[in-house]
Amino acid sequence: MKRISIYIGLCMMLICTCLPAFAGPEAEFRKLEKHYTLRADGSQELRVRKELTLYTHAAMNGLYGETFITYDPAFQELQIHQSYTQQKDGTIVKTPDNAFVEVLPSVAADAPAYNRLKEMVVVHTGLELGATIYLDYSIISKPGYLPALDVCCPVRELSPIKEFICTIETEKSPLLHYELLNYDAPAKRMDTRNNRQCVQWTLRNVSPRPYNYPTQHDRLSLIQEAASGMQPVIVATTHTSYAEALKTLRAQFVPGDEAVIKEKVTELAVGAEGDKQKLRDAIGQYMMYRYSRLGNISLKLADTGYRLRPASEVLRSGYGTTAELVNLDVCLQRAAGLEADIVICALRASKTDNVGLSGIVSVFARSGDMAMRVPLSGTAEADLQEYMMITDLSGNSVELENKWTEHARTYYTFEADDKRIRTLEGGIRLVKAEGKDMALILSDNYAKNTEIDAPVLLPMKYDHTFVTTVKLPEGMTWVRKSGREIVNACGKVVFTYEQAENAIKVTCRLVVNQQLLTPSSYPDFYALMREWKDENNYLLLFTPEAI
């Protein structure tokens, strides 16, 4: 009996060692507060207070060990009101002076025009499991630096939040437009003693956002997060309208020294011989190089105070933010007598005027003439256009051409001596039809798990057929196989195999007609992707006729 008890005890110990050591969150925000203030003189203040308790070494050493605060000292002042750590036993460890490290933001490292930007790295000290970080700081913007009060504040963090408070304080005039997206919590309106108005949201027990939430493009990730319903977002602005907000931005899109622009167009026109299409191609090739990482500085509009350098200055410097490069692109095309304009993409709210400049997620150039051998701009935006606002700089709605709206077909042909036909032992030939890798954007990024906990917005709908024709190698016989078809509410997957004369034709079709996936509809999408990724559906076997 004693021996049995020992065995049982050993088994329990083994089971315990196999169980996860920690099933809770990495950390927890006891309180996260953001207070936006617009003063009568036009200056603004963003005050952030956070109380964050750490539960794991990953949170302590990586995720929350440092806080990064970017600001522009030419127009903004950073004030650290309080920074300390309260250890588990109650001991207070104040952040020492040498733990406030001011550096150049990495995104501005190769851009002398933006080397004035600073990033304050607050290195939290005295950390241990169970410790709580307290940080309270303000970024104060000088009058005139920002055109209006503009708020775009995602709520959910990677860790749960016990209490989230967002307050917006302004003069009673101009009117404040505001909205909380994807969360049912009314705003509390308050009048302060000094004849000002406050709007405040208090959200409790906010669940964390998924750690590996799938999005396709950094610039459009907020669209996918918000439009899916996963991410609550507070938007607010004192601009009288969205069109008025764009008017202030439109004033930044200027050519500057037009002689510099025309000189560049003349240089690019060499070899075009007066051919309009060749000139468009030359401009497209030049801008493709500029849009690459070599010339594109990953600063957002808000990082530069919604200000742009003139196109001529961007041309001379050889680099620019995305918005600056778009301005240069359009200026070059217009100087060459080509048609081009600027397209603005922003978050969609229930009322257009609730969104200001901070809600802009993408800016790109739309051309009347397509450049050859150059990626078409705005394709990712076109795939998501029903989930965001798309306008020109005057606020007029813009409809983008969507390349996935119609059924597309791609054809491949393998000759009998094609190097892609592998020879196996016994003279057996193996061929892999095309198509599987063409939908990696969906199958690899959005079908990693068998289920999801939060809604997911796919980057596109999809309808594409891939036809591979394989010429029969001489003296070989095709090993017949049956077709496959799955049809459900999300779309369909079809594989057919036909023999005609001296060839085998493999037809693979993938249709995904449901872009917004919920936890209940996701299994249908996963079933399609699982079938589409099955290697066996693409393989053809040929055996020697003598076998």
Where are these regions (language model features)?
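A sensor for short, sequence-defined functional sites
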Residues: 23-547
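Bacterial N-terminal signal peptides
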Residues: 9-18
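Positively charged n-region of N-terminal signal peptides that target proteins for export
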Residues: 1-4
